[in-house]
UniProtKB/Swiss-Prot annotation:
PROSITE patterns: RIBOSOMAL_L10E. It comes from the Archaea. GO terms for cellular component: ribonucleoprotein complex; ribosome. NCBIfam families: PRK04199.1-4, PRK04199.1-6. Keywords: Ribonucleoprotein, Ribosomal protein. This is Large ribosomal subunit protein uL16. One of its GO terms (molecular function) is structural constituent of ribosome. The keyword Ribosomal protein applies.
Amino acid sequence: MSDKPASMYRKLSKPSYTRRDYVTGIPGSKIAQHNMGNLQTGPQDYPVQISLRIEEECQIRHGSLESARLSANRTMLKQVGQDNYKMVLRKFPHQILRENKQATGAGADRVSDGMRQAFGKPVGTAARIQQNERVFTIYCEVDDASVAKDGLRRAYNKMSPPCRIDVEKGQKLLIS
């Protein structure tokens, strides 16, 4: 069965639902890694820091975060090389998403319970993100800043809320 549209889970309308001790059957996170590029270097080793910020509070599902991570990381790997940047995914999908499955087709009314006991079963996880919070950060050299911006633009296209790309460190180096 395919995933429901992300618009079902985007709004922060329900209380946080994160206690994995009490919930069984939670699907695993699709996010493979949170730190990419040259893992031996720190953020202080790079003159430029560029981040992708979300402009409104929302929930982003783990599949969307992973596809955004893959596209940004692949762009950086191909054009810059693994040793010349560091990329960090700053959010972890703690929020458990539930869905009340509905039977469809012939005889569904006899099989389905409708809205009786409609709490729902876990179908995935999402990260809760507040307004103007950073999701991805790329640390790179001055020459690679345009590639980093392009990678974050590709990541932005994989997520539904409006985003912006901020140069947080090294703005003066990029202008000159």
